[in-house]
Design a protein with these regions (language model features):
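N-proximal low-complexity "stem/linker" segments adjacent to membrane-targeting elements
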Residues: 1-52
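Active-site-proximal specificity loops/subdomain of glycosyltransferases
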Residues: 30-39, 80-122
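Short beta-strand/loop segment that forms part of the nucleotide-sugar
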Residues: 65-75, 97-99
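Short beta-strand-to-loop acidic/aromatic patch adjacent to the donor-nucleotide binding site
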Residues: 120-132
């Protein structure tokens, strides 16, 4: 048996946790209440919980005995209580737990397990209203419901992080975070006299200081939705939350296996597919199959998810298969290769700048390229390319583009022309040229001038290079 709990915007002004996470922006109980029950915040979280968190729990619970507690305060506005009550009627595994203001509700899981009549081992987990557990979560946890593991925790560190704006999911990254809060499970037991044995707990990221912790990262087990309304993001400066999140998650590898994403989180895949443009291609990628904004002169898109259906006779390594992304700044100027873009790589090969490099499986597969660009940056087009002969033989069956602007397909030559005609500042062009040709410049200088004079000349060139970098950063 599994007992879970979501503490749904509980009003607990005496709690130290909200004070620690809000960056001292909320100085009074009235400020806290206004923040907690802000209509925009509640709409976002309630929609996420009812449209994603709960339906995924329902799928994961098939074949398992699961009770999921939703604890909320009596002061929760009726509008949101009604939404929870409707969900409780639709999903019989939900246990609605209304508490007096100020109550933490930490004792509810033990009260529920005692009332259930269950005896033996059970798992007790927690889940925030803006996170999700994968459809295979309880299948993965079931083997640990055994007597030898009682008194331990099991943590499932492998998951996905994604930006969510209330409508679109984007920027999917693989994350490995031991003892994260998503589904951290205490392995407990209860006997016929209602006596409970449970591991000693503490702050989730310090769980192993209190009790033994089993780590199982064999499967993707959770999706963490990142958004500018996160409670623990209040410490950031106003307007910088998403930028911080992009740079933090950009350190993690992108998730490219769309079939894995769709299997673990079907509600997220359905949201991506909803309203996406579909292109039937049915040809080898060759030296490039391009896509550009359909409306000439239109502003690019900052949030886009691209799904490619591929068919390959053999597996292709990520260094040989690329989706080149034409990213521009607020003035419509091409971003130079030397300029870092959160979550994207930049390579010199084949006149390619910012991109996603990805592996291709043998046979049929679907891969996803998803990005959420920083403020002032946008995508004008993209090109799917093979960087070696066997990669160029990969068949691109279909392309799906989920974005707030229309795209149309173009051949490799037209995409190259689009790249060439997108303006690039002179200092950026010189900078890219120096970076690209530095090794050959060094070799020629050494051959013509000799080692000592070449080093002197290159030192002068480095000074020029630094000045150009300063100009390029303005």
């Amino acid at each position: 048996m599994f007992i879970g709990q979501t503490r749904f915007s509980l009003f607990v002004p005496q709690s130290g946790s909200w004070r620690a996470s809000n960056g001292k922006k909320l100085s009074s109980e009235a400020d806290y209440r206004a923040y907690l029950y802000d209509p925009q915040r509640m709409e976002f979280r309630t929609n996420h919980f009812i449209e994603h968190t709960v339906p995924l729990l329902a799928q994961a619970a098939r074949g398992h005995e699961v009770t999921h507690i939703v604890s909320f305060s009596e002061s929760l506005p009726q509008r949101w209580k009604s939404r929870l009550e409707e969900a409780g009627q639709q999903y019989d595994f939900l246990w609605l737990d209304e508490r007096k203001d100020g109550e933490q509700a930490w004792d509810t899981p033990q009260a529920v397990i005692r009332a259930s009549g269950h005896t033996g081992v059970y798992g007790s987990y927690r889940l925030d209203d803006d996170d999700m557990l994968a459809t295979g979560f309880f299948d993965a946890a079931q083997p640990y419901l055994a007597e030898p593991f009682v008194g331990m925790f099991v943590s499932f560190p492998l998951g996905v992080e994604a930006i969510f704006d209330g409508t679109h999911f984007s920027n999917f990254r693989l994350a490995h975070v031991p003892m994260n809060s998503m589904g951290l499970m205490a392995l407990c037991s209860i006997d016929a006299e209602k006596n409970i044995r449970a591991p000693k707990g503490g702050p989730h990221d310090l769980t192993d200081r209190y009790s033994p912790v089993i780590l199982d990262a064999r499967h993707v087990s959770y999706l963490r939705s990142l958004h500018d309304g996160q409670d623990n993001a209040m410490r950031y400066q106003d307007g910088s939350v998403l930028e911080r999140l992009l740079h933090e998650t950009g350190k993690n590898p992108p998730l490219h296996d769309y079939d894995q994403l769709a299997s673990a989180f079907p509600t997220v895949a359905a949201r991506i597919d909803q309203g996406a443009q579909e292109f039937a291609v049915g040809e080898a990628v060759g030296e490039g199959v391009g896509f550009a904004l359909a409306e000439q002169g239109a502003r690019g898109v900052a949030d886009v998810t691209i799904v490619l259906s591929l068919n390959s006779e053999e597996p292709i390594g990520p260094e040989h298969f690329v989706v080149y992304l034409l990213v521009v700044d607020a003035q419509g100027r091409k971003l130079p290769r030397h300029q870092a873009v959160a979550g994207l790589k930049s390579i010199k090969r084949g006149r390619i700048g910012h991109c996603h490099l990805m592996p291709v499986k043998e046979g049929q597969s679907r891969v996803v390229v998803s990005l959420h660009l920083e403020q002032g940056q946008s995508l004008q087009g993209f090109c799917v390319k093979g960087l070696e002969p066997k990669a160029q033989k990969v068949s691109l069956e279909t392309v799906s583009v989920a974005a707030d602007a229309a795209f149309h397909s173009v051949d490799a030559a037209r995409f190259a022309a689009l790249v060439d005609h997108t303006p690039l500042r002179v200092q950026d062009r010189v900078h890219d040229l120096l970076v690209d040709r530095w090794d050959s410049i060094r070799a020629v200088a050494t051959r013509v001038l000799g080692q000592q004079r070449a080093e002197w000349a290159l030192a002068k060139l480095r000074l020029l290079y630094r000045r150009i970098r300063r100009l390029a950063s303005r």
